[in-house]
Amino acid sequence: MAKFLNTSATTYYLEELIKQAKERLWLISPYLKFNDRIKELLEDKNRMKIDIRIVYGKSELQPAEANWLKTLDYVRTSYCANLHAKCYISEGGCIIGSLNLYEFSQINNNEMGILLLRRDDTAVYQDAYAEAQRIIRISEEVKISLDVVEKQLKASQKGIRKNITRHLLPPN
């Protein structure tokens, strides 16, 4: 039977869903800014070679998140325009609710959600699974690149060299 989740319960069961995933884990959320605990759990699942799909809907993926995601070989990231859904699903269960995968939301917002277990809520779980599959299909897979960050770093280093040179050379 479905279980109602408040903010802390949603966070707790999201962590449990990630920990208990054995085959696949799909995380669908417009916003991505993972807290350290979720990162640690996803890194562990990556080491276990679990198929992880992350779908996000806001294009402003922060460089720190992009850099971190790039290190995970078994995580596929996709962008879905107009995404507002928040659904976290594994082979054993599903959470549907208001919680974004955004560190701020998990700490500061009042959230609600529903936990569905595949064994207890088979029909509803299958409907949610099918919709999550559809969202993944219509999403564009994103290959995370560090090009922009590297260009910014080079420009920044060039500026630092100019400043150092300016301060080291005697004035004319």
Model region roles, listed by residue range:
Residues 62-65, 86-87, 105-107:
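Short, charged, surface-exposed secondary-structure boundary motifs
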Residues 58-59, 81-84, 100-102, 119-120:
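Short, acidic/turn-prone active-site loops that include or flank metal/cofactor-
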Residues 66-86:
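Structural recognition of alpha->loop->beta junctions
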Residues 86-89, 114:
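Short beta-strand scaffold segments in enzyme catalytic cores
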Residues 96, 101-172:
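Signature of lipid phosphatidyltransferase scaffolds
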Residues 10-72, 172:
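Primarily the HKD phosphodiesterase
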Residues 1-10:
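Glycine-rich phosphate-binding "P-loop"
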